[in-house]
Structures are given as C-alpha cells and as structure tokens.
Amino acid sequence: MGQLVHITDESFEQETRGEMPVLVDFWAEWCGPCRMVAPVLEQIATEQVGKLRIVKLNVDENQHTPMHFGVSGIQTMILFKDGQAVERIVGFMPKPQLMKRLQPHLSAATPTPTA
C-alpha cells in the first residue's frame, strides 16, 4: 500500500533522486486546499505503488526547499524525476485532472520485465 512520507529540507534531495517519479506536496496546516487534496494524494499513492512516490513537505517548518524552487504560494505540487522538476501543479485539482497531468510521467516508470 502506498503511503505519504513527510520529508524535510535535509532529506529532500535524497527523497527526490532516482528513476521513479516523486510528487512533492508543498503544504501547511492552515492551507484549506492542502487539506482537500490530502485524501486524493493518499488514493493516488495507493493506486500507483511502484510507479510514483508522493511525499509531503511542510513549508512552515522547511523554508529553504520551497524558496529554492520558487514556491510562492500553496497549494503547490512539483513532480521530480531523476532529481529534476518535470511538472508543477498549483492549486487544488480533482483526482481525474491531477492524474491527467501525472500520467505522461508515470508510463516511463513502469518496470521492465526481466527474463
């Protein structure tokens, strides 16, 4: 089962490296849209195990990373692949629209069968 992992400025680089896409949810306790998207992200994390990791970074407790990536407002999500930002999503988005934005990046993450 997929699970949302909470990361920090210190663990950010390690958590977003690698071939598997990583969606970083930049959030805060007081952010209404962040609370609205949380159950959607939990569903996606469960459904996309092995294709996508979803992590959460609290912008009130970790200010360096959002500043580095120009996150000026939340709710913001950035999709990383091989440590590089490949997609930025700002504002609440229902699951079908969110998956439409993520899907092109997930197909490349499908594991290759071994003989």
Predicted segments — roles?
Residues 19-20, 27-30, 73:
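Short pre-active-site segment immediately N-terminal to redox-active cysteine/selenocysteine motifs
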Residues 26-40:
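Conserved redox-active cysteine motifs that mediate thiol-disulfide chemistry
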Residues 20-21, 38-57:
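Conserved helix-turn-beta segment immediately C-terminal to the redox Cys motif
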Residues 59-61:
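The beta1-alpha1 cofactor-binding region of Rossmann-like NAD(H)/NADP(H)-dependent oxidoreductases
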Residues 3, 8, 27, 53-55:
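Conserved Rossmann-like nucleotide-binding pocket used by diverse enzymes
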Residues 63, 69-78:
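Structural micro-motif
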Residues 78-111:
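Non-catalytic, surface beta->alpha helical segment in thiol-disulfide oxidoreductase systems
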Residues 4-22, 63:
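A short beta-strand-turn-helix
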